[in-house]
């Protein structure tokens, strides 16, 4: 099996570890051997620094990024790719990290880091899809949209016989990290969610599955509508 670094972000690690377990199982069935690197001289949990970046704490974010490089270095030298579940985290490997730290290693990460579905689509011929007579609503995370990374999810879902896929034509869900939790920004967050995302979900019955790879998107849907949205890996 082809080895691949699985970058486990803070949100999925602590709040939805079932997504990580599901991703590992799916990746194995697709012919990959996912593994989770750690720092050799520390028990510190790796973080991409996204939460620091979102608050302008660049130096703090760079420290987290340097830890990732230390942990990944032996595997980067072997030409092993990286896959992640949280779009805003894994896509920082293609954007913020190589822009803030300019080395051959970060350039490698820029060109060899993939979202879960981007990696799976490469091996889709090896995956045995079960037929499912269901409808799913797909909400793309803002980072996925910015990197044109929603299409791979659609392509994978369309390989499942009997599955009806509707890609909700939305902008941001309104949560935007912690934006939707702010006292001064809550109303704006709700207005954004009620533009298209919430109405589309409410138009569909509860047996329609909502797929959203972004943790903040799933939280917005859960808090705003009391509907469970799932990561593609769990679906």
Predicted regions and their residues:
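Iron-sulfur cluster-binding electron-transfer modules in prokaryotic oxidoreductases
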Residues: 1-235
């Amino acid at each position: 099996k082809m080895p691949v670094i699985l970058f486990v972000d803070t949100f999925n690690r602590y709040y939805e570890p079932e997504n990580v377990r599901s991703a590992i199982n799916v990746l194995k069935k697709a012919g990959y051997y996912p593994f989770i690197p750690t720092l050799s001289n520390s028990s510190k949990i790796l973080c991409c620094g996204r939460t620091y970046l979102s608050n302008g704490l660049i130096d703090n974010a760079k420290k987290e990024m340097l830890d990732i490089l230390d942990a990944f270095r032996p595997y980067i030298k072997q030409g092993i790719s990286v896959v992640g579940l949280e779009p805003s985290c894994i896509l920082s490997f293609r954007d913020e990290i190589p822009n803030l730290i300019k080395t051959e290693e970060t350039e490698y990460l820029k060109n060899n880091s993939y979202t879960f579905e981007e990696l799976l689509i490469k091996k889709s011929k090896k995956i045995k899809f079960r037929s499912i007579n269901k409808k799913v609503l797909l909400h793309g995370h803002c980072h996925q949209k910015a990197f044109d990374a929603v299409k791979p999810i659609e392509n994978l879902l369309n390989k499942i016989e009997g599955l009806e896929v509707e890609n909700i034509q939305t902008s941001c869900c309104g949560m935007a990290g912690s934006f939707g939790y702010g006292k001064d920004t809550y109303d704006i967050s709700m207005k954004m969610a009620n533009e298209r995302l919430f109405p589309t979900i409410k138009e569909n019955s509860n047996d329609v599955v909502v797929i959203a790879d972004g943790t903040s998107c799933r939280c917005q849907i859960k808090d705003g509508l009391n509907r469970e949205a799932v990561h593609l890996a769990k679906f």
